[in-house]
């Protein structure tokens, strides 16, 4: 099901990743104290067209919330989600 996606936190590249087939979406971040700044959003058009944008961003927000970190969205796409 489309809502059941698994994201990965690639700490080395400082980005959350979502792989679907040969496509990868990513949200880059920067950590500062107990805040995470979501700075850049990239998603292949194929995934956007399939409705993965909101699902991916929500999954990232859920992951960050579970860690007890404040989210500071700076990417226009992430801000638009709110």
Where are the regions that the model predicts?
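Conserved acetyl-CoA-binding loop-helix of GNAT-fold acetyltransferases
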Residues: 49-62
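Structural motif
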Residues: 10-12, 32
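Conserved N-terminal entry element of GNAT/NAT acetyltransferase domains
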Residues: 1-7
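A generic "binding-loop/recognition-motif" signal
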Residues: 23, 77-78
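A short, structured beta-strand/loop element
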Residues: 17-46
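A generic local structural motif
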Residues: 4, 24, 57-59
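Conserved GNAT acetyl-CoA-binding A-motif
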Residues: 62-77
């Amino acid at each position: 099901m489309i809502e059941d996606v698994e994201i990965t936190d690639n700490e080395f590249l400082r980005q959350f990743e979502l792989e679907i087939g040969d496509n990868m979406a990513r949200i880059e971040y920067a950590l500062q104290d107990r805040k995470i700044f979501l700075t850049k959003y990239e998603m292949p058009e194929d995934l956007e067209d399939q409705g993965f944008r909101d699902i991916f961003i929500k999954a990232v927000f859920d992951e960050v919330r579970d860690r007890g970190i404040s989210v500071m969205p700076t990417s226009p796409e992430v801000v638009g989600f709110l």
